[in-house]
């Protein structure tokens, strides 16, 4: 142990850890305080001297009561799952969750993010189980008594909250990237799906290495899931832990890997969070904002520009839909509890701020700055200030205004946009007025596209005042003016456009959000012929989210035959199961018995969401047929929408004897899943039928 602030006293985190009698070398033991082991050393040590402390203890994590956060809903540190094996639906497991300071519940340690060390764990486990920890498994010793000692060694320094161990009955599926072992620990029944669930990890590594200019810095990478996990996932160094929601069967994966962006998020943490760690919880943005934004980067790279922009848009909306958080600074030097910083500001808002920063400096400088930040702080700590210095070093620009505004400030702009054509001057006037309540004015670099007679002219302006006016040449009234043309800014805007302008915008759209704005306005003006034209065109859009939005916009009661035919086509053969699901829902709203055979056929689709939508549609026109199919489906393994559809129909039309099935389905679902939330309604509906006081 080498600690520059120690001289003759050592203070170590101690949460419900009982010290046991032991010979302690070079240490005069004192009674522990409530939360710390506070001990006098035998002499004064200089910062360069190394000394060893031995502590014999028993940890009691089940007795610890700590505050949770929005991201992590418990704080025991170490968890025993189904330890006595009494629950036949759940395997026996042990796993740990260190963030924020849960490691010190089971391990006496200086439990702060700016403390880094190597580690070695010797785990005695039942021989039938496997273990996982940070670093490499360097040795296994058979005790000849049904147990085994696994020795895991981590020889590169990392923070205590990233210390990890897990034990359980897992199957290990091996992969490889540039000679480094990639391991996927799965429950036995998911062995065949392991590569489909985790198999993009090598491609993600290659992409992140390429944009950062830094190879994956650790000896191996393993991924594992834990039952009853208290969060979504955790980037424990070399050993990421996922919720069991990552485990998807073959039918689920037909609808796409719902956990792909989470896998990308946790991997990116191995640079931003593990290699360079936030120096304090106040600076958690340099961990979480980057991991959040990595999802946008990965989807943009792997699935195209629209997919990346959609991910960015969803993050923006998640932040904007939490107005109570708007007054929080991204870098939070003042908070009531460290858990409070894990919120939409540190994640989604921070990710959108990085998106603006990337656009401000350009891709080349953005990724070079990230490289510089990582190289200069590797195996150490980072902060927003260090990030700023890296960007200024690469770009040669003073970025005080950007970081003061977005990192060390709060809120976001609310703008009112007015457009006027001045025929005598042959100009278009754009007035941008900031109306946010805070006593602050944002500095905003804004890209503007002005379309005149089909020709696009691009301009770059700066909005630095509460009200700014901009004039642009226009020989005739513009077809459309697209402000924030690349949809970069984190703001709320209020602007009025005609349906003709939105029709032009959709037809000449350069990105996903332009088209989304157009179909949203068209949906509000559904009786207008131009709005109808926008929505009909959107039914054939190249991006599935736009097609879904267009379907949702039509009122089933007012569908014309051509549009109904198109929606039927989408329900039958769209490449996206989510679009099929939406189209079936739209057809269901017609209550046409002529679709009974199709709905019945689609209940057997290989996709859970398609079959579930079809079952709901069938129930609207023939509840007896739907009940029969739901009863048959209840004898099989079902998930996602098919599960919620089956349980809803059984609860509504079935007898008391369906209670056991629904109770079992409800019980086995992850508590954090949307599926369990929706099933709560059906479960409650069923209870009044059960005659069991």
Report each predicted region and the residues it spans.
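Short, solvent-exposed loop/turn and secondary-structure capping segments
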Residues: 64-78, 132-135, 162-165, 233-236, ...
């Amino acid at each position: 142990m080498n600690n520059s602030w120690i001289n003759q006293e050592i203070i170590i985190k101690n949460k419900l850890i009982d010290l046991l009698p032991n010979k302690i070398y070079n240490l005069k033991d004192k009674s522990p305080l409530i939360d710390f082991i506070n001990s006098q050393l035998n002499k004064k040590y200089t910062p360069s001297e190394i000394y060893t402390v031995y502590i014999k203890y028993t940890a009691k994590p089940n007795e610890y009561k700590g505050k949770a956060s929005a991201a992590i809903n418990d704080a025991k540190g170490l968890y025993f799952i189904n330890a006595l094996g009494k629950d036949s639906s759940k395997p026996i497991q042990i796993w740990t969750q260190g963030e924020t300071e849960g490691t010190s519940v089971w391990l006496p340690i200086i439990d702060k993010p700016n403390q880094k060390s190597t580690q070695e764990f010797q785990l005695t486990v039942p021989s039938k189980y496997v273990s996982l920890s940070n670093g490499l498994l360097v040795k296994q010793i058979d005790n000849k008594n049904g147990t085994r000692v696994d020795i895991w060694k981590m020889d590169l320094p990392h923070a205590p909250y990233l210390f990890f161990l897990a034990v359980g009955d897992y199957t290990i599926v091996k992969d490889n990237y540039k000679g480094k072992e990639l391991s996927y620990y799965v429950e036995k029944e998911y062995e065949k799906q392991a590569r489909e669930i985790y198999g993009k990890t090598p491609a993600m590594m290659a992409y992140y290495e390429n944009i950062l200019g830094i190879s994956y810095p650790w000896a191996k990478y393993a991924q594992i899931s834990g039952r009853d996990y208290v969060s979504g996932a955790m980037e424990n160094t070399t050993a990421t832990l996922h919720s069991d929601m990552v485990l998807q069967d073959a039918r689920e994966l037909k609808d796409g890997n719902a956990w792909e962006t989470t896998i990308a998020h946790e991997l990116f943490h191995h640079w931003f969070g593990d290699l360079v760690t936030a120096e304090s919880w106040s600076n958690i943005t340099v961990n979480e904002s980057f991991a959040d934004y990595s999802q946008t980067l990965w989807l943009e790279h792997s699935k195209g520009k629209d997919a990346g922009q959609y991910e960015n848009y969803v993050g923006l909306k998640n932040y904007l839909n939490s107005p109570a958080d708007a007054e929080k600074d991204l870098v939070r030097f003042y908070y009531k509890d460290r858990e409070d910083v894990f919120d939409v500001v540190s994640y989604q808002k921070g990710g959108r701020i990085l998106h603006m920063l990337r656009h401000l400096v350009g891709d080349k400088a953005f990724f070079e700055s990230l490289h510089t930040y990582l190289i200069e702080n590797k195996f150490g700590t980072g902060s927003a200030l260090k990030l700023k210095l890296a960007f200024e070093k690469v770009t040669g620009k003073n970025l005080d205004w950007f970081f003061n505004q977005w990192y060390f400030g709060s809120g976001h702009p609310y703008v009112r946009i007015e457009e006027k054509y001045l025929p005598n001057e042959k100009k278009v006037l754009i007035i941008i007025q900031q109306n946010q309540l805070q006593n602050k004015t944002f500095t905003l670099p804004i890209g503007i596209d002005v379309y005149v007679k089909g020709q696009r002219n691009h301009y770059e302006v700066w909005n630095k005042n509460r009200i700014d006016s901009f004039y642009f040449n226009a020989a005739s009234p513009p077809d459309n003016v697209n402000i924030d043309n690349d949809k970069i800014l984190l703001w709320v805007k209020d602007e009025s456009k005609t349906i003709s302008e939105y029709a032009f915008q959709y037809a000449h759209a350069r990105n996903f959000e332009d088209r989304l704005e157009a179909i949203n306005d068209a949906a509000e003006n559904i009786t207008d012929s131009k709005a109808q034209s926008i929505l009909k065109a959107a039914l054939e859009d190249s991006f599935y989210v736009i097609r879904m939005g267009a379907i949702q916009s039509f009122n089933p009661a007012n569908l014309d035959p051509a549009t109904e035919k198109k929606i039927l086509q989408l329900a039958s053969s769209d490449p996206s199961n989510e679009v099929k699901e939406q189209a079936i829902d739209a057809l269901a709203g017609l209550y046409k018995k002529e679709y009974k055979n199709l709905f019945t056929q689609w209940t057997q689709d290989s996709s859970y969401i398609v079959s579930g939508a079809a079952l709901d549609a069938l129930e609207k026109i023939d509840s007896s047929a739907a009940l029969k199919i739901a009863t048959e489906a209840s004898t099989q393994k079902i998930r996602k929408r098919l599960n919620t559809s089956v349980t809803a129909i059984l609860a509504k039309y079935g007898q008391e004897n369906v209670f056991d099935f629904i109770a079992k389905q409800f019980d086995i679902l992850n508590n954090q899943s949307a599926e369990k939330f929706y099933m709560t309604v059906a479960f409650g509906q069923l209870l009044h039928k059960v005659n069991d006081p």
